[in-house]
């Protein structure tokens, strides 16, 4: 009886491990960069093993030039709901590009919350080939020196700049997009009929989950970052007489 019991348990465990993994958060048509997530999984698994062997071990964090011990559970990095394609933890600066959101950065020692794969735009993108233009000009960069931000409640919070995992310093980066200029052309937004419309370009924001600090504790909070440049229109008052 005991031999049959152990045989059934072994078969059950093999079946669970062989079950295909699905991710309902993945948009249709998007694929996962396997090389990137293999490296990420290795780093996280190593951190989890050390965390289990040394319970409540603090992770060193450097905030505004000072070293402080911030208690962080490495398992937080594995929660899907915290992932954002605009937040990146990396041991080295990501590629700097003013025209692209390079979400496929796969350098060693990178923790990105993004699980999607997007094609990189370049000067050969069809938009440029067809002679199409954007109504507003934008610039996109990875920001790695953010120290404070506004959270979703309107309060100013301290952004955690770096965390130390397995003696490797991971820096927190944010991919931000903002307007290059308020008025790309003299009349306002490009391509807008200035006879009937007033227009100007403005930077819009969204909220992403970021690692912040409060009272010597690290916590995830929604903070506001720049994410797009849009055109604002107002109709001109008709002339009288």
Swiss-Prot record:
Gene3D superfamilies: Cystine-knot cytokines (2.10.90.10)
UniProt keyword Signal, yes or no: yes
Prodomain positions: 19-121
Compartment annotation: Secreted; Endosome lumen
S-S pairs: 136-201, 179-229, 189-231
Coiled coil segments of this chain: none
UniProt keyword terms in alphabetical order: Cleavage on pair of basic residues, Disulfide bond, Endosome, Glycoprotein, Growth factor, Metalloenzyme inhibitor, Metalloprotease inhibitor, Protease inhibitor, Secreted, Signal
GO biological processes: cell surface receptor protein tyrosine kinase signaling pathway; modulation of chemical synaptic transmission; negative regulation of neuron apoptotic process; nerve development; nerve growth factor signaling pathway; neuron projection morphogenesis
GO CC terms of this entry: axon; dendrite; extracellular space; synaptic vesicle
Residues carrying sugar: 69, 114, 166
Signal peptide: 1-18
Subcellular location, principal: secreted
InterPro entries, alphabetized: Cystine-knot_cytokine, Nerve_growth_factor-like, Nerve_growth_factor-rel, Nerve_growth_factor_bsu, Nerve_growth_factor_bsu_mml, Nerve_growth_factor_CS
Domain of life: Eukaryota
Molecular function, one GO term: metalloendopeptidase inhibitor activity
PROSITE patterns noted in UniProt: NGF_1 (PS00248), NGF_2 (PS50270)
Protein's job: Nerve growth factor is important for the development and maintenance of the sympathetic and sensory nervous systems. Extracellular ligand for the NTRK1 and NGFR receptors, activates cellular signaling cascades through those receptor tyrosine kinase to regulate neuronal proliferation, differentiation and survival. Inhibits metalloproteinase dependent proteolysis of platelet glycoprotein VI.
Family, per entry: Belongs to the NGF-beta family.
Subunit (UniProt): Homodimer. The homodimer interacts with a single NTRK1 chain. The homodimer interacts with a single NGFR chain. The NGF dimer interacts with a single SORCS2 chain (via extracellular domain). The NGF precursor (proNGF) binds to a receptor complex formed by SORT1 and NGFR, which leads to NGF endocytosis. Both mature NGF and the immature NGF precursor (proNGF) interact with SORCS2 and with the heterodimer formed by SORCS2 and NGFR (via extracellular domains). The NGF precursor (proNGF) has much higher affinity for SORCS2 than mature NGF.
Protein name: Beta-nerve growth factor
Gene name of this polypeptide: NGF
């Amino acid at each position: 009886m005991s031999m049959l019991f152990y045989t059934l348990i072994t078969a059950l465990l093999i079946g669970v491990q062989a079950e295909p993994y699905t991710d309902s958060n993945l948009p249709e048509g998007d694929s996962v960069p396997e090389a990137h997530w293999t490296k990420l999984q290795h780093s996280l698994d190593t951190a989890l093993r050390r965390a289990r062997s040394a319970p409540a071990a603090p992770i060193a964090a450097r905030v505004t030039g000072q070293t402080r011990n911030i208690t962080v559970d490495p398992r937080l990095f594995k929660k899907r709901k915290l992932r954002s394609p605009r937040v990146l933890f990396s041991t080295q600066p990501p590629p700097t590009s003013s025209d692209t959101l390079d979400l496929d950065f796969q350098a060693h020692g990178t923790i990105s919350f993004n699980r999607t794969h997007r094609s990189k735009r370049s000067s050969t993108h069809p938009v440029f080939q067809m002679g199409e233009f954007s109504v507003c000009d934008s610039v996109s960069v990875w920001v790695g020196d953010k120290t404070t931000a506004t959270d979703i409640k309107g309060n100013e919070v301290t952004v955690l700049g770096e965390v130390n995992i397995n003696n490797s310093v991971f820096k927190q980066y944010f991919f931000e997009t903002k307007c290059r200029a308020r008025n790309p052309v003299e009349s306002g937004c490009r391509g807008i009929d200035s006879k009937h419309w007033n227009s100007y370009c403005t930077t819009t924001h969204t909220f992403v989950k970021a690692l912040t600090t409060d009272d010597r504790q690290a916590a995830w909070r929604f903070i506001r970052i720049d994410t797009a440049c849009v055109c604002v229109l107002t109709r001109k008052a008709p002339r009288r007489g």
